[in-house]
From Swiss-Prot:
Its main location: cytoplasm. One of its GO terms (biological process) is transsulfuration. This is Cystathionine beta-lyase. Catalyzes the cleavage of cystathionine to homocysteine, pyruvate and ammonia during methionine biosynthesis. Also has cytotoxic activity toward osteogenic, osteosarcoma and tracheal cells, in vitro. The chemical basis for cell toxicity might be the formation and subsequent transfer of sulfane-sulfur to proteins, derived via beta-cystathionase cleavage of L-cystine. Belongs to the trans-sulfuration enzymes family. One of its GO terms (cellular component) is cytoplasm. It holds the Pfam family Cys_Met_Meta_PP. Keywords: Amino-acid biosynthesis, Cytoplasm, Lyase, Methionine biosynthesis, Pyridoxal phosphate. It catalyses: L,L-cystathionine + H2O = L-homocysteine + pyruvate + NH4(+); an S-substituted L-cysteine + H2O = a thiol + pyruvate + NH4(+).
Length: 396
């Protein structure tokens, strides 16, 4: 029998979202099946009308497949537990989740403050969509005088911590106090922590977005996002926007995410352990100027990481004193690191960050140095280190 009264998240992740027992047979599958359905039928009009009332009030209710079935409801429960929230709304990707936040909480003529370390496509969301709708955005760096940037029309602060490319730690409790002082909503992109090692809602944020594509899924085979809140009024706005704009997730992707969270505790621990071993190696290489990884003791954000996080993951960035061509040679010489933009799966990945991407980040002080972002996967760290060594030797 499943007991979800246990407090430790590792235990909860093994039991939340389990299939209920069949009342006739007393049996249940270990894994909740993927419920693929476009149409929902009801026993009576009264049952249908009750579901419609609950949905209109912002509660979880299925009246049509687009709103999600049992598989989706189970995953929403898992995300809410991960983040310490009360309501969860699914979207087809992490960026779709971010767009749900902006479109739910902002109207024409209103203004948002967005941390410059946020996920790069947020700039495209602003330029292609938000600006066209009359929503203004100001990007700020962590050292900025935020009070000077607040306008009478400012409604939202959106931050990603640690940051997307350089893993800059932000003081989330301080941002939360500032937001409360100015009557602003604080929303975060928490894909790095995914609720397992970092929980912005417990630090004062009101909304947290996770790209379940990454560490929640863990196998590089699904796409989905989740928006979690612990604020009833915000939940109603998210609920209405999710419905009105047709945000939807396939049942199979939701099922894959439920599968992924079962192994999240062991995967996250191994990613984090391997990343620190790689940092130990890289710090002694002459080509390496600086490491960006908040769990690394020399990282400027290490104290904030110790205070606010319960663990780490496989993400790090490496500043290299190499020419542009040598940096390209290094990336191309790697054999165990796939060249790609994503992360959070079982595999190791490398991304050569462009100067244009770095120019948006005030945290970057590396000038013309090269920057590579590494995702350290579940492979043997000795093999990964050997691969990095031979690639650096070839690029030198």
């Amino acid at each position: 029998m499943s007991d979800t009264s246990a407090k430790h998240i590792d235990t909860l992740l093994q039991h939340l979202g389990s299939a209920p027992f069949n009342p006739d047979t007393g049996a249940a599958p270990v894994n909740l099946p993927s419920v693929r359905a476009s149409t929902v039928r009801f026993q009576s009009l009264a049952k249908l009308e009750d579901a419609q009332r609950r949905k209109a009030a912002g509660e979880r209710a299925s009246t049509y497949g687009r709103m999600g079935m049992d598989t989706h409801a189970a995953l929403e429960q898992v995300f809410a537990e991960l983040e310490g929230g009360t309501h969860c709304y699914l979207a087809s990707s992490g960026l779709a989740g971010i767009s749900m936040v902006f479109l739910s909480l902002l109207s024409a003529g209103e203004h948002a403050l967005v941390a410059d370390c946020a996920y790069g496509p947020v700039h495209e969301l602003h330029e292609a969509v938000l600006s066209r709708l009359g929503i203004d955005v100001t990007f700020f760096d962590a050292k900025a005088d935020l009070a000077s940037l607040v306008r009478p029309t400012t409604r939202l602060i959106f931050a990603e911590a640690p940051g997307s490319l350089l893993f800059e730690m932000l003081d989330m409790p301080a941002l939360a106090r500032f937001a409360k002082q100015h009557d602003l909503i604080l929303a975060t992109d928490n894909t790095w922590g995914s609720g397992y090692i970092y929980r912005p809602l417990t630090l004062g944020a009101q909304v947290s977005v996770i790209a379940g594509t990454k560490y929640v899924g863990g196998h590089s085979d699904l796409m989905l996002g989740a928006v979690v809140t612990n604020d009833e009024a915000i939940a109603k706005r998210l609920n209405r926007t999710q419905y009105a704009l047709g945000y939807s997730v396939s049942a199979d992707d939701a099922w894959l995410a439920l599968r992924g969270v079962r192994t999240m505790p062991v995967r996250m621990a191994q990613h984090a352990r391997h990343a620190l071993e790689v940092c130990e190696f890289l710090q002694n290489r002459p080509e390496v100027v600086r490491l960006y990884h908040p769990a690394w003791p020399a990282d400027p954000g290490h104290a904030l990481w110790q205070r606010d996080c319960s663990g780490s993951n496989g993400m790090l960035a490496v500043q290299l004193g190499l020419s542009p061509q040598a940096a390209r040679d290094f990336v191309n010489a790697l054999t165990l690191f796939g060249i790609g933009f994503s992360w959070g799966g079982f595999e190791s990945l490398v991304q050569l960050v462009t100067p244009g991407e770095l120019a948006r980040h005030q945290y970057w002080q590396g000038g013309s140095d090269a920057l590579v972002r590494l995702h350290i996967g579940l492979e043997s760290p000795a093999d990964l280190i050997a691969d990095l060594a031979q690639a650096l030797d070839r690029a030198a």
